[in-house]
């Protein structure tokens, strides 16, 4: 946790059927203690709005709950260190849908260490403490700010999320 001042645990509706898991907080998130702030948060809000979801109506957290030095990607060691905490977090929230945003979230919950482009947009199931959860992997909004050409793929993923919400008759 060198260079990190504050843990960013999660925020939003703890009773939501949707849990969104990102990579790790950046400077603004660390400062405010809230998830997905600044430009990344603005893009996430627009993405969710496109499928009729308000960010405050879902629960969001991070794979690694501290800001890595120089905002670098969390290491596999850091991901493993926080994975038990993340799994406990999931069992407390008990979401019907988990949206994994980015490769760090994907690696933590699925063990996959492949490219997001190969795994995104597919519904999978993951077992956490004897309960099965529906997950979908998509790009992290911070990545989309750097690689906007992938927004079209995220839109496809968002439409699948919207359809799953309808199929499961979830109230968001």
PLM feature spans:
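A polyanion-binding, active-site-adjacent surface
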Residues: 1-172
């Amino acid at each position: 946790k060198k260079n990190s001042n504050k843990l960013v645990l999660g925020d939003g509706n703890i009773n939501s059927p949707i849990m969104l898991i990102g990579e790790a907080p950046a400077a603004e998130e660390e400062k405010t203690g809230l998830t997905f702030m600044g430009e990344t948060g603005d893009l996430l809000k627009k993405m969710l709005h496109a499928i009729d979801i308000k960010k405050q109506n879902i629960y969001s957290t991070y794979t690694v709950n501290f800001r890595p030095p120089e905002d670098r990607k969390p290491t596999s060691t850091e991901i493993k260190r926080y994975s038990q905490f993340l799994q406990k977090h999931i069992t407390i929230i008990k979401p019907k849908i988990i949206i994994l945003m980015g490769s760090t979230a994907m690696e933590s919950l699925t063990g996959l260490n492949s490219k997001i482009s190969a795994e995104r947009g597919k519904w999978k199931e993951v077992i956490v403490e004897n309960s099965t959860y529906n997950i979908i992997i998509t790009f992290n909004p911070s990545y989309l700010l750097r690689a906007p050409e992938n927004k079209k793929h995220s839109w496809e993923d968002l439409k699948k999320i919207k359809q799953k919400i309808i199929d499961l008759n979830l109230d968001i």
